[in-house]
Design a protein with these regions (language model features):
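An accessory alpha-helical subdomain
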Residues: 87-90, 94-168
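Catalytic cores of RNA-modifying enzymes
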Residues: 1-112, 163-173
Length: 174
Protein backbone atom coordinates (compact mmCIF):
# COMPACT_ATOMS: atom_id res chain seq x y z
CA UNK A 1 0.00 0.00 0.00
CA UNK A 2 1.70 3.19 -1.22
CA UNK A 3 -1.11 5.72 -0.78
CA UNK A 4 1.17 7.99 1.23
CA UNK A 5 3.81 8.17 -1.54
CA UNK A 6 3.69 10.70 -4.38
CA UNK A 7 5.84 10.54 -7.47
CA UNK A 8 6.69 13.81 -9.13
CA UNK A 9 7.51 13.53 -12.82
CA UNK A 10 9.04 16.38 -14.78
CA UNK A 11 11.80 18.93 -14.48
CA UNK A 12 12.17 19.42 -10.72
CA UNK A 13 13.26 23.02 -11.24
CA UNK A 14 10.03 23.84 -13.08
CA UNK A 15 7.27 21.74 -11.46
CA UNK A 16 5.37 22.70 -8.34
CA UNK A 17 6.02 20.06 -5.72
CA UNK A 18 3.00 18.32 -4.20
CA UNK A 19 2.53 18.68 -0.45
CA UNK A 20 5.11 16.46 1.24
CA UNK A 21 7.06 16.06 4.46
CA UNK A 22 9.93 13.89 3.20
CA UNK A 23 11.67 13.63 -0.14
CA UNK A 24 14.03 10.87 -1.28
CA UNK A 25 15.82 11.29 -4.59
CA UNK A 26 18.86 10.49 -6.65
CA UNK A 27 19.26 14.09 -7.79
CA UNK A 28 20.44 14.85 -11.31
CA UNK A 29 24.05 15.67 -10.52
CA UNK A 30 24.11 18.80 -12.67
CA UNK A 31 21.10 20.25 -10.79
CA UNK A 32 22.07 19.59 -7.16
CA UNK A 33 22.83 23.18 -6.19
CA UNK A 34 19.84 24.66 -8.00
CA UNK A 35 17.53 22.12 -6.35
CA UNK A 36 18.87 22.86 -2.87
CA UNK A 37 18.06 26.54 -3.46
CA UNK A 38 14.53 25.52 -4.53
CA UNK A 39 14.06 23.23 -1.52
CA UNK A 40 15.12 26.08 0.80
CA UNK A 41 11.72 27.66 0.03
CA UNK A 42 9.79 24.47 0.82
CA UNK A 43 8.33 23.18 4.10
CA UNK A 44 9.54 19.64 4.90
CA UNK A 45 10.79 17.31 7.67
CA UNK A 46 13.72 15.79 5.83
CA UNK A 47 15.34 15.34 2.45
CA UNK A 48 17.48 12.30 1.61
CA UNK A 49 19.51 12.59 -1.56
CA UNK A 50 22.22 10.82 -3.48
CA UNK A 51 24.68 13.47 -4.69
CA UNK A 52 28.22 13.52 -6.10
CA UNK A 53 30.76 12.96 -3.33
CA UNK A 54 32.67 16.06 -4.44
CA UNK A 55 29.46 18.06 -3.95
CA UNK A 56 29.42 17.10 -0.25
CA UNK A 57 32.74 18.95 0.11
CA UNK A 58 30.97 22.11 -0.98
CA UNK A 59 28.17 21.45 1.51
CA UNK A 60 30.51 20.95 4.46
CA UNK A 61 32.83 23.83 3.72
CA UNK A 62 35.84 21.69 2.78
CA UNK A 63 35.60 23.71 -0.42
CA UNK A 64 34.51 27.26 0.48
CA UNK A 65 31.32 28.13 -1.42
CA UNK A 66 28.03 30.03 -1.49
CA UNK A 67 26.43 26.66 -1.00
CA UNK A 68 28.04 26.32 2.45
CA UNK A 69 26.36 29.58 3.46
CA UNK A 70 23.02 28.23 2.21
CA UNK A 71 23.50 25.02 4.20
CA UNK A 72 24.40 27.01 7.33
CA UNK A 73 21.31 29.19 6.96
CA UNK A 74 18.72 26.51 6.16
CA UNK A 75 19.77 22.94 6.89
CA UNK A 76 21.17 20.44 9.34
CA UNK A 77 23.35 18.16 7.21
CA UNK A 78 24.20 14.49 7.76
CA UNK A 79 26.42 12.56 5.37
CA UNK A 80 25.72 8.86 5.71
CA UNK A 81 27.66 6.79 3.26
CA UNK A 82 29.57 6.79 0.01
CA UNK A 83 28.14 4.92 -2.95
CA UNK A 84 30.54 3.51 -5.57
CA UNK A 85 29.83 3.90 -9.31
CA UNK A 86 29.18 0.14 -9.55
CA UNK A 87 25.96 0.59 -7.54
CA UNK A 88 24.34 2.40 -10.49
CA UNK A 89 23.23 1.40 -13.96
CA UNK A 90 24.46 3.17 -15.97
CA UNK A 91 27.54 3.86 -13.87
CA UNK A 92 28.58 7.46 -13.24
CA UNK A 93 32.29 8.21 -13.47
CA UNK A 94 32.40 9.52 -9.91
CA UNK A 95 31.72 8.45 -6.33
CA UNK A 96 28.39 9.45 -4.81
CA UNK A 97 27.25 10.10 -1.24
CA UNK A 98 23.96 9.74 0.62
CA UNK A 99 23.01 12.87 2.54
CA UNK A 100 20.11 13.94 4.74
CA UNK A 101 19.00 17.53 5.15
CA UNK A 102 16.64 18.74 7.87
CA UNK A 103 15.41 22.32 8.17
CA UNK A 104 16.80 24.48 10.94
CA UNK A 105 16.18 27.93 12.28
CA UNK A 106 19.66 29.12 11.33
CA UNK A 107 20.84 32.68 11.00
CA UNK A 108 17.69 34.74 10.49
CA UNK A 109 19.47 37.43 8.47
CA UNK A 110 21.00 34.91 6.05
CA UNK A 111 17.73 33.01 5.84
CA UNK A 112 15.73 36.13 4.95
CA UNK A 113 18.44 37.21 2.52
CA UNK A 114 18.63 33.89 0.67
CA UNK A 115 14.84 33.52 0.55
CA UNK A 116 14.85 36.53 -1.77
CA UNK A 117 17.51 35.11 -4.09
CA UNK A 118 15.74 36.35 -7.23
CA UNK A 119 15.75 40.00 -6.11
CA UNK A 120 18.37 42.70 -6.35
CA UNK A 121 20.54 42.78 -3.26
CA UNK A 122 19.55 46.34 -2.32
CA UNK A 123 15.82 45.52 -2.52
CA UNK A 124 16.16 42.36 -0.44
CA UNK A 125 18.21 44.16 2.22
CA UNK A 126 15.76 47.06 2.28
CA UNK A 127 12.87 44.65 2.90
CA UNK A 128 14.76 42.85 5.68
CA UNK A 129 15.50 46.16 7.40
CA UNK A 130 11.89 47.33 7.03
CA UNK A 131 10.68 44.06 8.62
CA UNK A 132 12.99 44.85 11.56
CA UNK A 133 11.25 48.21 12.09
CA UNK A 134 13.09 50.74 9.92
CA UNK A 135 11.22 53.09 7.64
CA UNK A 136 11.78 52.67 3.92
CA UNK A 137 13.91 55.84 3.86
CA UNK A 138 16.06 54.64 6.79
CA UNK A 139 16.48 51.21 5.20
CA UNK A 140 17.55 52.67 1.84
CA UNK A 141 20.11 54.88 3.60
CA UNK A 142 21.45 51.98 5.68
CA UNK A 143 21.88 49.79 2.59
CA UNK A 144 23.63 52.59 0.70
CA UNK A 145 26.22 53.15 3.45
CA UNK A 146 26.74 49.46 4.29
CA UNK A 147 27.08 47.82 0.87
CA UNK A 148 29.03 48.94 -2.23
CA UNK A 149 26.84 49.96 -5.18
CA UNK A 150 28.30 47.22 -7.41
CA UNK A 151 26.87 44.63 -4.99
CA UNK A 152 23.58 46.45 -4.39
CA UNK A 153 22.67 46.22 -8.07
CA UNK A 154 23.26 42.46 -8.44
CA UNK A 155 20.60 39.81 -7.96
CA UNK A 156 21.40 37.71 -4.89
CA UNK A 157 21.66 34.53 -6.95
CA UNK A 158 24.49 36.14 -8.96
CA UNK A 159 26.59 37.24 -5.98
CA UNK A 160 29.97 35.61 -5.52
CA UNK A 161 30.96 34.07 -2.21
CA UNK A 162 33.14 37.10 -1.44
CA UNK A 163 30.26 39.48 -2.20
CA UNK A 164 27.92 37.54 0.09
CA UNK A 165 30.55 37.71 2.84
CA UNK A 166 30.78 41.46 2.27
CA UNK A 167 27.00 41.80 2.70
CA UNK A 168 27.11 39.72 5.89
CA UNK A 169 29.99 41.82 7.29
CA UNK A 170 28.07 44.98 6.42
CA UNK A 171 24.99 43.90 8.32
CA UNK A 172 25.86 41.39 11.02
CA UNK A 173 29.60 41.85 11.33
CA UNK A 174 30.59 38.18 10.90
Amino acid sequence: NFNHISFCLGNALEVDFPKYNKCVSNLPYTLCEALLWKFSREDFESLVFVVPKKFTGRLTGIVESRLKLLIDAFYELDIFDDVPPEAFDPQPKIMSSIIRLKPKKGNLFLREFFMQYDKKTKNALREILMKSGMTKKEAIKQVSISIPLRIQEKNIVNLSLEEIKEVVRGFIGE
